[in-house]
A protein has these predicted regions:
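Membrane-proximal HAMP signal-relay module
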Residues: 1-26, 33, 38-56, 87, ...
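A conserved beta-strand-to-alpha-helix junction within the catalytic ATP-binding
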Residues: 2, 97-112
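Short alpha-helical segment of the dimerization/phosphotransfer core of two-component systems
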Residues: 67-75
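Short conserved segments within the C-terminal catalytic ATPase subdomain
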Residues: 81, 117-132
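Conserved micro-motifs of the catalytic ATP-binding
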Residues: 89-96, 135-142
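Short helix-loop "hinge" at the ATP-lid/N-box region of the Bergerat-fold HATPase_c
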Residues: 158-159
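Short conserved segment of the HATPase_c
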Residues: 192-204
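Glycine-rich ATP-binding loops of the HATPase_c
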Residues: 230-248
Length: 278
């Protein structure tokens, strides 16, 4: 009886922790959504007062409309990230949707999608890896939608933290001996201190000393997708901290590395027994 009671107590304890975690997540999500929605309401009320008072200053109205557009974009981005988080956590659905994925194509398309944002922020965004028509030594089995989301979130995170004039590189490397494909996203931003490298994968966590406008869910989504694909992710400095000149104001940068296991290519079928000579 004692082992049964102990097992039940352990199960109840884990359920309680899970419910507490979910409640905290919902509270954090509500708080994050409240900020852009409050901005929407404030700017809409300001514009309405301007119109009611007959003081239709075009510059003031334009400023209010710009703030409304920005706040609505933030709210929409948060909702999209929450939906992505839900998809990434749906492990049962994921197992039913595995198919061969061309990760190089996803990486190239992601870089192309982010070029306008990189140019707007004066960041050099580039891709290094297999070109169209070049394959891997093995097959990556996964969910294309989630893997695209992973590459997008890592790239977006790098662009968010890289200052103007910096560089972001999306890199794909094939390891034929280890039967893995390695995806790296490298930037020239401030980097992530070693003590915070596990913390940044928590929902809504922001590195100390940063003031980046984002949902705070991107890396949490990345971790869920990595775990679903039985991959591993690590964070390191892009450049040794000892080699940096403090007076230049250049950070070590962050290097995110994801290793995906590959399945071997199917062996070519041999001739049928009927085709063999006697």
């Amino acid at each position: 009886v004692a082992p049964l009671v102990s097992a039940i107590n352990d199960l109840l304890s884990r359920l309680d922790r899970s419910m507490s975690t979910q409640k905290q997540f919902l509270a954090d999500a509500a708080h994050q959504l409240k900020t852009p929605l409050a901005g929407l309401r404030m700017q809409a009320e300001l514009a309405q007062r301007e119109i009611d008072a007959g003081q239709q200053d075009p510059k003031q109205l334009k400023s209010s409309l710009q703030h409304i557009a920005h706040s609505s974009q933030r709210a929409a981005h948060m909702v999209n990230q929450l939906l992505s988080m839900a998809r990434a956590e749906d492990k049962e659905s994921g197992r039913r949707q595995l198919q061969e994925v061309n990760l190089a194509r996803l990486a190239r398309e992601t870089v192309r999608d982010f070029v306008p944002k990189a140019m707007e922020n004066r960041i050099d965004l580039g891709y290094e890896g297999p070109d169209e028509g070049q394959g891997l030594h093995g097959r990556l089995m996964g969910q294309p939608l989630l893997l695209r989301e992973l590459v997008r979130n890592l790239t977006d995170n790098a662009l968010q933290y890289t200052p103007a004039g910096g560089t972001v590189t999306v890199r794909l490397m094939d390891d034929p001996f280890g039967q893995v494909v390695v995806l790296q996203v490298e930037d020239t931003g401030p980097g992530i201190p070693e003590a915070e490298r596990d913390l940044v994968f928590r929902p809504f966590y922001r590195a100390l000393g940063t003031n980046v406008d984002g949902s705070g869910l991107g890396l949490a989504i990345v971790r869920e997708i990595v775990q679903q694909h039985e991959a591993e992710i690590t964070i390191s400095d892009a450049r040794p901290r000892s080699s940096l000149n403090a007076g230049q104001g250049i950070g070590p940068g962050a290097l995110f590395t994801v290793r995906f296991p590959l399945e071997p290519d199917p062996a070519p079928e041999g001739p049928s027994p009927e085709a063999l000579p006697p």
